[in-house]
Amino acid sequence: MALLGRLLPLALALALGPAATHAGPAKSPYQLVLQHSRLRGRQHGPNVCAVQKLIGTNKKYFTNCKQWYQRKICGKSTVISYECCPGYEKVPGEKGCPAVLPLSNLYETLGVVGSTTTQLYTDRTEKLRPEMEGPGSFTIFAPSNEAWASLPAEVLDSLVSNVNIELLNALRYHMVDRRVLTDELKHGMALTSMYQNSNIQIHHYPNGIVTVNCARLLKADHHATNGVVHLIDKVISTVTNNIQQIIEIEDTFETLRAAVAASGLNTLLEGDGQYTLLAPSNEAFEKIPAETLNRILGDPEALRDLLNNHILKSAMCAEAIVAGLSLETLEGTTLEVGCSGDMLTINGKPIISNKDVLATNGVIHFIDELLIPDSAKTLFELAAESDVSTAVDLFRQAGLGSHLSGNERLTLLAPMNSVFKDGTPRIDARTKNLLLNHMIKDQLASKYLYHGQTLDTLGGKKLRVFVYRNSLCIENSCIAAHDKRGRYGTLFTMDRMLTPPMGTVMDVLKGDNRFSMLVAAIQSAGLTETLNREGVYTVFAPTNEAFQALPLGERNKLLGNAKELANILKYHVGDEILVSGGIGALVRLKSLQGDKLEVSSKNSLVTVNKEPVAEADIMATNGVVHTINTVLRPPANKPQERGDELADSALEIFKQASAFSRATQSSVKLAPVYQRLLERMKH
């Protein structure tokens, strides 16, 4: 094993080549992708790189690890081919690309990289070819032949009609008066071109894509005797206007222009920086309901959030997006920016109508839908995009809609739609009060909630917060999705209807005929005061059916010894509040008797000591009650205390309760949880 540990690093170093055995500067993302392509191509010989080509196009990419295994770029299938890595060439009869390309001057190197059209236009000028062939050190970002061919006819005509001014200036804009390799091309930097010292914008993305004024580098670092050539996929042009100036020029941004002016963001958009503006057109604003749009435009904070949600923190050129990316806006929302073929998508929608409009301080993509952040929405608007539509309909039917559309600071606890699969409660005064208890009197964020915290509701109740290892619950209901924080209200999506506590544990047990025998046993064991006082208890409450299932002799023996009865009853009471949503695969809950109860939950079935819980989460002010149809016994190896005081009275009380149970159990009918809740509210 020790020998293997020494050999593995050596084997890896030999596989990666000499560069891997020496510490040096960190490789750029482009160089790392190129290295991966070289590793994938090495089976075909030295200096062979694997290249992925989009099927049906001429677009090629050096392959990174993710693209290699997925065989997709922008959701489209690719084919793998193998070609010489930059700077190498084939030798007849030899495997791979063993020979280093001979160096020539810049002009000749243009032909080597496949930019013969650039050579042709260079020949048409009087001054440029001698510079490219003469002494000096230059960098040329050379458009590919396809890039020149894709220029609009009127643009190309204007260039070639005046070759010694327009064409010469255009070519000089693609040049820098020093050698610049890809490891020097830093994200967000500007290079000074040889045309009037105009800036060229460089972006070097983590996925290895490098862009020059949003044109992608196709073949990089081709050395020449007097410089270096990088092949790019577009003809680039000078950039003179900032983002704000472009907004002022474009007629399609009339509404955006007014909104920016009202928000004061024009200072940001005309200042220094590198941003991406997802610029909504006039039509995008017109798609929004007038009431919503007027509300946002009239609210300075909501308006600023709206506009900031259209600004990314860095310049993102379209060519840099080859798969889905999560990008944060200035507002703080994360947008999913992706691509499908040649189309860019925002949150999965192809809403970008024009891309890569360059500005001196970033790039603009035109969009035809407005991106309204949660922070600019009402609770109603938040709920419309969430899985809580049934609950929101209940609030509206109960006449509580104004709370969800106004400027009241609230947190809405909205049960998800699946809670109501068996139907919804009838709207009456009690239901309305129940719904009011799903509204907290403050705008909260779940990340600030803590165990034992109490929350005041519009219905006048105090709700408790329970924090468990894998869940966060408010009374019996647990948060089922991330918060949605709106302009004034926050939406919590809950996994069930919330049950406010209606009394102590003893009040709950006394108010339910199913527990008459248990109540009698508690009274005879002297535990009434315990379950009435302030505390945090979880009670696994045996029903009358559970007691009646005990053999008569065992039942009489149990009831004939008050101390043993108290010991067993204490074993049914945990010393903390554990609602069903807080139960994981297994929770060991310490009982008041001293031993631990094993509580688990699987597929919505809660068990205690492997016995099923018939009904969970009956909330009390000092705990929670879970109904069980069995009597639990402490572990047999723990000696039970014995005694016979109060035995006669205990047995008598129990007999009376048993008789009462037989008389009433036929009339007890299990109802849906929310109906039972409404019944408890009568007491």
Curated annotation (Swiss-Prot):
Domain EMI: 45-99
GO molecular function: cell adhesion molecule binding
Modification after translation, per record: Gamma-carboxyglutamated; gamma-carboxyglutamate residues are formed by vitamin K dependent carboxylation; these residues may be required for binding to calcium. According to a report, does not contain any vitamin K-dependent gamma-carboxyglutamate residues.
Localization per Swiss-Prot or TrEMBL: Secreted; Secreted, Extracellular space, Extracellular matrix
Residues recorded with modification S-cysteinyl cysteine: 65
Short name of one Pfam family: Fasciclin
FAS1 domain ranges (all copies): 103-236, 240-371, 375-498, 502-632
Induction remarks: By TGF-beta.
Entry superkingdom: Eukaryota
S-S pairs: 49-85, 74-339, 84-97, 214-317, 473-478
Annotated Gene Ontology cellular component terms: extracellular matrix; extracellular space
Phosphoserine PTM positions: 37
Signal sequence region: 1-23
The protein's role, per its UniProt record: Plays a role in cell adhesion. May play a role in cell-collagen interactions.
PANTHER family per record: PERIOSTIN-RELATED, TRANSFORMING GROWTH FACTOR-BETA-INDUCED PROTEIN IG-H3
Protein name: Transforming growth factor-beta-induced protein ig-h3
